[in-house]
């Protein structure tokens, strides 16, 4: 019954998001939800608060709202094709393309490196919208599973996936073909460099697997795989990050 109710709720949300500006929808939903975290996010909310206080000091963080907002944004883009959101994503792609296309024209392969901000799905769609119009995204299971459940549209024609959870031989074959096409300027590779802790915990424990640097005016620790891949391709890494323009 609960699963059926959730499915009906998602269909209703999707139908509304096809007709309502996503910013209005988010504003109304936030006013209605109250301040208490949803039960499924409660423990992660507590961990997120502790991490924020440890790293950045005191400050308010509504983790449950951030997670819910991300899910609605993903639905608005992939399933509902919300007109306002699609326009904003196209604008972001156009900005990114001002950097990417000249690099390709100059004979330099491109490795796109979005941050884990706002939504991984939206960041991937922005990267898929730049020259030459095709990309392979190296992902964990979440983005790939979400995209495969989405309706058939141009995003699924532009994007291919290489999951870090696949069989190693399959990963090697997929990456080899992807790198060949990237070197020939037929596609970009999208890799989230601030890769989530689950990958690091289940792979290389070596300190060398992390790279200390500065990004967007802040200290950062990135997974060094982005460096190795860019060196192998002799590619230019283009970092980008989505944010809410207030």
Segments from the language model and where they lie:
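Membrane-anchoring hydrophobic helices of lipid-metabolizing enzymes
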Residues: 1-120, 125
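Short amphipathic alpha-helices and their capping/turn segments at secondary-structure boundaries
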Residues: 52-58, 174-189
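Membrane-associated lipid acylation/remodeling enzymes share a hydrophobic transmembrane-juxtamembrane segment
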Residues: 133-135, 187-245
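Catalytic core segments in nucleotide and nucleic-acid processing enzymes
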Residues: 164-169, 177-184, 203, 224
